[in-house]
Design a protein with these regions (language model features):
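Metalloprotease/metallohydrolase-associated module, dominated by Zn2+-dependent proteases
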Residues: 1-48, 64-99
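Active-site recognition of the HExxH zinc-binding catalytic motif
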Residues: 51-63
């Protein structure tokens, strides 16, 4: 499940699902560091959306760690593996809210 907001190194990023990201920005996701926003293409499958979220989250982690020049290939590779590790092992942290 993708949260509405996420903190990276104490900085809050709002997560927004946007129509036609691919057509507007030629990306499936996008992080706006100065605005504190992660945008995801609303029309993606849930698995792909989660994978793209992890990808953008890693960009945020690198940026907040002071690494402004990021190798997109490394982010892609690590995000795919990290997403699969989290999913396959059903890993989550913090309190699970039940309704």
């Amino acid at each position: 499940m993708i949260p509405d907001k996420v903190k990276v190194a104490g900085i809050e990023y709002r997560v927004q699902e946007v129509e036609d990201m691919d057509r507007q920005f030629d990306h499936l996701g996008l992080i706006l560091y100065t605005k504190g926003v992660i945008k995801l293409d609303k029309n993606l499958s849930q698995d792909r959306k989660e994978q793209v979220f992890i990808h953008e989250l890693l960009h945020g982690c690198f940026y907040e760690a002071g690494i402004e020049e990021q190798d997109e290939d490394i982010i892609n590779r690590v995000s795919i593996v990290l997403y699969q590790v989290l999913k396959d092992n059903k890993l989550h942290f913090g309190k699970i809210e039940t309704s």
